[in-house]
């Protein structure tokens, strides 16, 4: 039985999409708790973030047979993972962040538009690093 095209594939992608930002949010919340002096609370957030990472990795293990949920490219072997990373980062710096910056600027959010443009530059750098690394092992 193939996972490709199934409702279960959709569910795994949805679950992965939920777990990944939860990890980042909890790490951010931990940082805030540290600043406010709640070290024990920060530890709870960090521990839970690590659990969310484990959940996301579990979803990816099942999704390996159908491809990267972000790019649709094959995942599993390092060369394929690097190629997928290049594609994902390239999308972010060529389409995603420029489009978001344009929208933010049109809506009058200049500082946020500048932030998105800064991120586009960072993503371009990431894509270049991944591409260089891929070429070095090919």
Which positions does each model-derived feature cover?
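Non-heme di-metal
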Residues: 1-138
